[in-house]
Regions:
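Bacterial N-terminal signal peptides that target proteins for export
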Residues: 1-7
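HIT superfamily nucleotide-processing domains
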Residues: 18-183
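Bacterial N-terminal signal peptides
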Residues: 7-16
Length: 183
């Protein structure tokens, strides 16, 4: 029983380390010494790529997500990077590129998601692209005509988007929208 008790204490002590939360991100491309942190790896990846196109696509390196792509903007804002730091034309181009990649890979079964800051493991803004899981739809969404109409998430919030006929359903206030996508 004593060993079990110590294991429980250790697990509780380590629990905060298992949380994904980039609200205190320090990644700054102008200060190379800040870029060594694990949560800065997508920033480093983007900096190592050609300046064009403005959105680049990489496979998710998490071995538990073999079916996922990530859309990375060339944009570097303040840390942690959020969509609200981008201009409306930058956001529209970014959403459009992610949706196009989703359609290319998954046809009409695509879904895209951006996790909230408390659930993100990377400081660099990124959109998860995957196949929408069956049964994911819920009643908490807004209908928009296209990428230009996708609302900007409130500070730190996440969202997920999928096709609905010739419109899009945007599910807001979703901390971990990527869970609606095939891993």
């Amino acid at each position: 029983v004593s060993t079990l008790r110590w294991f429980a204490i250790l697990a509780l002590w380590l629990l905060p380390l298992s949380r994904a939360d980039v609200r205190a991100c320090l990644c700054d491309v102008a200060r190379p010494e800040t870029m060594a942190a694990r949560e800065c790896s997508l920033c480093r990846d983007v900096e190592a790529m050609p300046a064009e196109p403005q959105t680049v696509f990489v496979r998710d390196t998490n071995p538990n997500k073999p079916n996922r792509w990530l859309a990375l903007p060339r944009f570097h804002g303040k840390s942690p990077q959020q969509l609200l730091d981008m201009t409306a034309p930058e956001r529209t181009a970014y959403w459009s590129a992610a949706i196009a990649k989703g359609r290319e890979v998954w046809g009409d079964e695509w879904g895209i998601a951006m996790n909230g800051l408390e659930k993100r493991t990377q400081c660099h803004a990124h959109i998860h692209i995957g196949k929408l899981l069956e049964g994911s739809e819920n009643d908490h969404f807004v209908v928009v005509d296209g990428p230009a109409d996708i609302p900007v998430p409130r500070d730190g919030d996440g969202l997920w988007v999928h096709p609905a006929g010739d419109k899009l359903h945007v599910h807001t206030d979703e901390p971990a929208g990527e869970l609606k996508l095939l891993r």
